Regions:
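Interfacial segments of alpha-helical transmembrane regions
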Residues: 11-18, 75-90
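Membrane-anchoring/interfacial helices and their immediately flanking loops
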Residues: 1-38
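Ser/Thr-rich, low-complexity intrinsically disordered terminal regions
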Residues: 3, 28-53, 57-60, 64-80, ...
Length: 220
């Protein structure tokens, strides 16, 4: 015997759920494609995630809103399901919009606590600039403290000597890479962080420099 035909309300709820999942699923696919070097960062992040997935998430809100109206006309249970889907769709859309706005902020990509004599980082384009409110710890940090600070800020230590610690950090999502160096001198410890990309990053480079300085001060 043939199964019962789906009601308009049920079909609307299903459509809303599919639409709500489309944006996040595309973003996940974009991350995987960038990680596999199948597409460029510009294609995966700027196009697929911050434009197409964002547009899909906004469209999902519209679909979920229409679905809620149809579902409530069918039954209370389907209406509640559609309402829950709408709430999720609004949350996802808001998250995409927030991320797009943050990533559009053009923060500095080469920052240091010593503008007169920044710690050296190979192939850094420069010039280094200061981050607002971030200043060098006016003390000579121990090598162990500097290494701990690197790890606390999410950097993998790539080189260490008596007066210098180097590290590299690769973002977990789209692989945005930063290099950092902590230079130890009598009476002062300086930090430099350089982004290995040329794009707006919402101030991520300054945030990492702040994390390093805060960790150095906490480890004194």
């Amino acid at each position: 015997m043939a199964g019962r035909r789906a009601t308009p309300g049920l079909m609307a709820v299903r459509a809303a759920m599919v639409a709500t999942l489309a944006g996040p699923l595309l973003a996940i696919v974009a991350v995987l494609l960038v990680g596999a070097d199948a597409v460029s960062l510009e294609t995966g992040l700027d196009l697929l995630t911050l434009k197409v997935a964002l547009a899909l998430s906004v469209l999902a809100v519209v679909v979920a809103l229409v679905a809620m109206v149809i579902a409530f006309r069918t039954s209370l249970r389907l209406g509640v399901m559609a309402l829950a889907t709408l709430v999720v769709a609004v949350g996802i859309s808001g998250a995409f919009l927030w991320r797009a706005q943050v990533m559009a902020i053009a923060g500095p990509l080469d920052v240091t606590t010593d503008l007169a004599d920044p710690p050296a980082i190979a192939n850094a384009a420069g010039p280094s600039v200061a981050c607002p409110g971030v200043s060098a710890p006016m003390t000579q940090s121990a090598q162990g403290t500097a290494g701990w600070a690197m790890q606390q800020a999410g950097f993998r230590i790539t080189g260490a000597s008596l007066f210098q610690i180097r590290g590299e950090r690769t973002g977990a999502v789209f692989g945005l890479t930063h290099e950092a160096v902590i230079r130890i001198r009598p009476g002062q410890t300086d930090v430099r962080v350089v982004a290995r990309y040329d794009r707006a990053d919402g101030g991520e480079t300054c945030r990492l420099a702040t994390k390093l300085v805060d960790a150095l001060q906490a480890g004194r």
